[in-house]
Amino acid sequence: MIIAAAPVRQSKSQIGFYLEQNRPNPFRSLTIIKYTLPCKSRVTVVITNSYGKVVDKLISATQDAGSYELKFSADDLPRGTYFYHVVADQFCDSREMEVLK
């Protein structure tokens, strides 16, 4: 479940698409996923389990260039390894995260 999605201030050094590792990781309930878009893009962020099944869709929207952070709550997910995937036009990247209970 997404708690909040908000643009954050972008530094001049942030050029190009970039997906950061979620923090904290591992986590029990709440984590933050940050990514940067160099241009206005159609963005989709999903969470999958270790079998590749989509367990949550965090966002599917057009976003302006800049840096963004999503606050993600894993309260409804069991303990385990999950992946978050960011797709923005021609960019696609994924990271692993660990949910503790």
Name what the model sees in each region.
Residues 53-59, 93:
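Surface-exposed loop/edge segments in extracytoplasmic proteins
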Residues 40, 65-67, 77-81:
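Extracellular Ig-like/FN3 beta-sandwich strand-entry sites
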Residues 42, 67, 92-94:
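Short, mixed charged/polar active-site loops
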Residues 21, 58-62:
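Beta-strand-rich interaction surfaces with strong enrichment in secreted/lumenal proteins
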Residues 3-47, 69-72:
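Glycine-centered coil/turn sites that cap beta-strands in beta-rich domains
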Residues 2-8, 71, 75, 79-101:
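C-terminal tail/sorting-segment detector
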Residues 49-51:
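Residue-level recognition of short loop/turn positions
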Residues 37, 62, 74-76:
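Residue-level recognition of secondary-structure-to-loop junctions
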